[in-house]
């Protein structure tokens, strides 16, 4: 069955980039999009990335959507095993490109490459230092 949006506003409230506005969606401020975007980012884009600790993707809207509550766990083992919930920034940054490919080459984020992910780590770290809170 097709599930229509309930217009509860949860996604609008939680979105780090405020990309939802009624029925409109602005992908250019979506954190998931920005974590994959190549090149330098504007200060505003950097701040959006730094709002959550994820270096790739976001899915905050999916997390709060009522349609995603109480759904059954997938029967596909590949989606339930070998999960990665944390990456140590320092260890990640010290990997050579070859080590990165060997360690993370089969992960969904690996196609974007190490440099973009390190850039995202940096934005998150910079925004969440004691100095940035002043």
Predicted regions and their residues:
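Long, compositionally biased charged/polar accessory segments in the mid-to-C-terminal portions
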Residues: 102-103, 110-128
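Extended alpha-helical surfaces
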Residues: 69, 75-91, 106
């Amino acid at each position: 069955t097709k599930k229509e949006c309930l217009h509860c506003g949860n996604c609008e409230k939680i979105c780090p980039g405020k990309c939802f506005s009624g029925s409109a969606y602005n992908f250019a401020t979506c954190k998931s999009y920005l974590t994959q975007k190549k090149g330098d980012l504007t200060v505003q884009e950097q701040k959006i990335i730094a709002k959550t600790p994820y270096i790739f993707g976001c899915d905050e809207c999916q997390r709060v959507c009522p349609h995603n509550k109480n759904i059954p766990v997938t029967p596909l083992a590949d989606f339930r095993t070998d999960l990665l919930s944390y990456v140590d920034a320092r260890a990640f940054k010290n990997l050579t490109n070859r080590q990165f490919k060997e360690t993370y080459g089969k992960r969904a984020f690996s196609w974007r490459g190490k440099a973009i992910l390190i850039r995202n780590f940096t934005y998150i770290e910079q925004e969440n230092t004691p100095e940035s809170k002043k």
